[in-house]
């Protein structure tokens, strides 16, 4: 396990990020539904920001988008709110969870539109994986998220071994 209750790591709160983006006609099909690829682009960007904040010195690259659930449609004119946090750290890899909400600015309603789990890897200047700080698990929620992330990581490694 790569977690710590000491000061040599970082808390998930130190690297979390949130952003809001207005969806434009160029982001959508002729019926007004936002393309999934547009959402994936923003998911990858914010996950990369969280991973970079955690890794510090190292460059980070996306290894996989392990889960992307589109739960509700997003439309032109919606404000899309992406909230991202780090759940799990191994030696050089980091699992980032991104929650996607869509706000209808006309009626002020917000729906949970999707969730993504993204794995990023820290690399050095030679493109080789490099160690990142451990996670400081300072509350029960962070401990639970870490354990769930560890379970998902083991599952991903088993799936990769089958390929």
Language model features with spans:
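HotDog/MaoC-like acyl-thioester-processing domains
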Residues: 3-13, 75-76, 87-163
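Hydrophobic beta-strand-centered segment that forms part of the acyl-chain substrate-binding groove
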Residues: 12-14, 34, 48-94, 111-115
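Short amphipathic
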Residues: 12-25
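Residue-level recognition of specific faces of alpha-helices
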Residues: 20, 42, 64-67
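Generic structural detector for well-ordered beta-strands
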Residues: 20-23, 69, 119
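A conserved, well-ordered hydrophobic junction motif at loop->secondary-structure transitions
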Residues: 28-41
């Amino acid at each position: 396990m790569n977690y710590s209750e000491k000061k040599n790591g970082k808390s998930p709160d130190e690297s979390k990020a949130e952003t809001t983006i207005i969806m434009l006609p160029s982001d959508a099909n002729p019926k007004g539904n936002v393309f999934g690829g547009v959402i994936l682009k923003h998911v990858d960007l914010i996950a990369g920001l969280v991973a970079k904040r955690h890794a510090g010195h190292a460059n980070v690259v996306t290894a996989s988008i392990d889960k992307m659930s589109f739960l509700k449609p997003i439309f032109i004119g919606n404000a899309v709110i992406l909230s991202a946090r780090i759940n799990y750290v191994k030696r050089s890899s980091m699992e980032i969870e991104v929650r996607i909400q869509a706000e209808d600015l006309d009626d002020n309603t917000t729906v949970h539109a999707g969730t993504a789990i993204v794995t990023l890897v820290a690399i050095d200047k030679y493109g080789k994986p490099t160690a990142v700080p451990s996670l400081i698990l300072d509350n029960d929620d962070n401990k639970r998220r870490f354990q769930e992330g560890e379970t998902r990581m083991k599952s991903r490694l088993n799936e990769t071994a089958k390929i």
